[in-house]
């Protein structure tokens, strides 16, 4: 930097150092300025001033070229220089400020500071300022009006600095000072440039807006576009001609239709127009469409919109991720199914031969007061108007699942379940338990949306097991079902599905279930009914390895989860000690697969890790991506795992004791059912918890007073159903969880009751039950701790909701009863909860996607159809799927030929 620049900075832009300003006395400032700015042709007065200046230090002398002024400054008039010299004599001594003079406000009061002697002057060159002593300057900045000499010096400095004021890096138009306004600050101009550059980048990244096909060509891109005018010119005057006005009006019309899809492409606008409704991180400025009005079922359209969306998403997902045939080696063999005699089957049958008394009240229908008592493995006919079905399993229900059926098959629906043999039996979880049990398969017939089921629910066959209690059971999601009439060479049987059982002895059993028609055709005509079989499983899954196998180390197996996407080769299980274990079912590794002498397989896990400090109560696989898994344990934690990095969970949440999870297909989170023992007051119930990717807070789906034992979600409907200890089964339609649920209004409109079970006392004579307490809805039964005491003095009252329509839902009696129970219900926990609901499952099949099965402590299983959520869109999908299924699967010949391939007749080339 030359001395000219240093002299100008010292005078015009003195920088603050500490609390003082670094300037010399006015006379010294003028001398330094003149020393730097004078030319080679000086007057005598200027020469005398030059001689009074101190000698510069070595190395800082000015060369003649540096001391020469620019040509435009050499034309300075002599008159100004003489006036400058005359004024120098007047300001050679500092002028003291007047004591009563005010400067912008009140005068400061206090002791005066002693004046320090002026230090010897030194040339203002870089590096000579005393940085260690910032208070070494002798004189503060002079107050008061500036003298004529100072004004002349300021004018001279501005003229000298004008050629260097413009920076080549900034456009000249950015720093123009508007007339009558203050100059724009540097920060504001930089921010404006940044916004303009950001608008240009967004405009290039966004697709071009769709223009009107019949409109003229867009104007030249060199002309800046006008985004939107506040008002048209009065009288419609034309300024730039008709063609330009025509382009302008077409542009405004397109923007009105598309709601400002992106920012303006022009960078010459002072402020880029960005819509305020555009969310952060989104690439489109389109607003969320508003669904106003009411749907035909009586619910608002904004509540039904996620349901219609889930239908499309689930249909597309199953077409891409499901298969028609998997595990071809596990075909049922007739010789492995041994039919038990009545004496042999007796230890495996439930002890209760008759159900407790129960009555059903249906909303909108007259009460008949009929009490029902049905036999074991029997059912009652479906109601002709409400289509609900009930049957008795013989014991408390602890495990339940639907058999998956391909879309469009139109076949009968089946459910597999396990009931405890004894109504009063308890199962300790801390130790392994084995004993007789019965796995039941029930046929429900063809469940449709157009008509009432014509057939009763019937017991198909049972499988006798010696592995104790079955805590969980899961069917293979797809690829395990084939047509009932599939011709098989004996002893092969057409397969209904692959079923995995989580047993209390620590083992996981895998069964290949045949179609009932083919299996029952193998038994003799005088066979005992019901049919109970002793079956050899196709595979036994154990923890450990071939060298070290100790099932007691992990404890009981409490939960199962089958990989939801094809080829469904992985099966996960949760154990009592907090371990999560994974098996590769089609593995050929000799370290993981052993063939036993009876022909069955024994499989060992390929991966396991400690997920929780206590028992793993439930597992849920992410349907959209099989790399992710959610688990909930007795340590009150919910964890999300990436199976590629199982050493640490993605997210861990400790809130309450969770009983079951439901992970719906379209959403990035799980719906959680909880035990009320650790729940805060008013927060017990059902919550939706985000996995952590979107960062949403927990959404309170529905409040519950008692423990929610079971939870199930329907991917087709975007709806969850929950059954609790108080005997109430409710359903809740989830909002679109891809958006933040914090803005969801009136969640009470999204949930509705399906039925409510109450334990009602009655008189000694069954013909005269006390219906007064049932009608009041406030039962007050005596405390009975055993099943026998309870059924001798009570009966169950099921109060069903009309699910065909939801018109005026908030004012209907079942809805008011549900809301009253959410706030003022009283639980009696020191008696047998005979009305409690233990398991709830939505049908995963498209042909029966609106049907729901539930059961609990009483052993009664009930089936309901949520007819109000069925839509014409779902019916159209069913018809399309049936046509597609019939085109893919040709009807097979009834005759069996030797050597016929078991699978070649089933699959056709994919179109």
Swiss-Prot record:
Any one Pfam family match given in the protein's UniProt record, by short name: WD40
Feature: compositional bias, Low complexity: 263-275
Region called Disordered, residue ranges: 34-187, 205-297, 765-785, 889-911
Ranges annotated as biased composition (Acidic residues): 253-262
Entry GO CC: nucleus; transcription factor TFIIIC complex
Keyword Disulfide bond among record annotations: no
Annotated PROSITE patterns: WD_REPEATS_1, WD_REPEATS_2, WD_REPEATS_REGION
Localization (cell): Nucleus
UniProt biased composition (Basic and acidic residues): 64-81
Entry-linked InterPro entries: GTF3C_component (IPR052416), WD40/YVTN_repeat-like_dom_sf (IPR015943), WD40_repeat_CS (IPR019775), WD40_repeat_dom_sf (IPR036322), WD40_rpt (IPR001680)
Function: Required for RNA polymerase III-mediated transcription. Component of TFIIIC that initiates transcription complex assembly on tRNA and is required for transcription of 5S rRNA and other stable nuclear and cytoplasmic RNAs. May play a direct role in stabilizing interactions of TFIIIC2 with TFIIIC1.
Classification via PANTHER family: GENERAL TRANSCRIPTION FACTOR 3C POLYPEPTIDE 2, RNA POLYMERASE III TRANSCRIPTION INITIATION FACTOR COMPLEX SUBUNIT
Protein name (database record): General transcription factor 3C polypeptide 2
